[in-house]
Regions:
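Zinc-dependent metalloendopeptidases
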Residues: 73-74, 79, 106, 119-124, ...
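Non-catalytic architectural context of zinc metalloproteases
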Residues: 1-30, 57-63, 92, 158-171, ...
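A generic secondary-structure signal for well-formed alpha-helical elements
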Residues: 50, 103-107, 195, 199
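Short alpha-helical catalytic segment bearing the HExxH-like zincin motif
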Residues: 90-98
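Pan-zinc metallopeptidase signature
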Residues: 150-220
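Auxiliary, metal-adjacent structural segments of Zn-dependent hydrolase domains
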Residues: 8-88, 113, 131-144
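Low-complexity, serine/threonine/proline-enriched polar segments
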Residues: 117, 121-165
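Catalytic Zn2+-binding segment of zinc metalloproteases
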Residues: 99-119
């Protein structure tokens, strides 16, 4: 499929571009610099079948992102990206993460159907619980074995414990603290590590997750 990005330079308010069948819209002024070609290169990392659910990447000041303290979110065929972030590396990282969430729509059975990924995730949660207890942190077992997203647990990880402190605790267990949030975030965090960071550490610590990503590539 033909790509239509021909402009060079940074994304600006009012831009409406198309690349690899994805419409890129800049709704509001960006408080960071993002080169158009850098964004195009990230999109081109993926086989077309992996990005087929994404019709739009929209940059702007979105209430629903701000209220939930999200930098980006995938919803109904679009990736919404906050216009207020620290830099383009973080923005591109977030976009790849949300592409990971979009993949669940088409490949949910491949990723989750056999239950192997969920078992790997729960096992890691239990290992993390051991590390928490060493630090005097107690979380009810029913929360730690629940693979679904729990906003209270998310906030406890990010705000009460804090990701800087959690980073040391998850070493050798999760790729990053955010991967411990829920099963779906575990997958998207690994997707981001595999495609964007190209980090072989993921294969070492999360063999089931890595094998799912390899299988995904083979089927895309």
């Amino acid at each position: 499929m033909q790509n239509y990005i021909t402009n060079k330079g940074e994304l600006k308010k009012g831009n409406f571009l198309t690349h690899s069948a994805i419409n890129i819209v800049v709704k509001d002024h960006l408080l960071f610099d993002l080169d158009i070609e850098d964004l195009a290169r990230v999109i081109d990392i993926f086989p077309k079948d992996i990005t087929r659910n994404i019709d739009y990447i929209i940059f702007g000041n979105f209430d629903f992102l701000r209220k939930q303290n999200y930098n980006a979110a995938y919803k109904d065929g679009a990736i919404y990206v906050s216009n207020n972030q620290e830099g383009n590396h973080d923005v591109l990282d977030d976009i790849v993460h949300e592409i990971g969430h979009s993949v669940e729509d088409n490949y949910g059975d491949l990723v989750y159907g056999d239950g192997f990924l969920e078992r790997e995730f729960i096992k890691k949660r239990m290992l993390l619980d051991v590390e928490f207890r060493k630090e005097g942190i107690t979380i009810p077992k029913e929360k730690m074995i629940n693979p679904e997203y729990d906003q209270n647990l998310d906030l406890f990880f990010s705000q009460e414990i804090g990701y800087p402190r959690m980073t040391a605790m998850v070493q050798g267990i999760f790729y990053s603290p955010y991967g411990a949030t829920s099963l779906k975030e575990y997958f998207a965090n690994g997707f981001e590590a595999h495609y964007y960071h190209k980090d072989i550490y993921l294969q070492k610590i999360s063999p089931v997750l890595h094998s799912k990503l390899v299988e995904l590539e083979e089927n895309a």
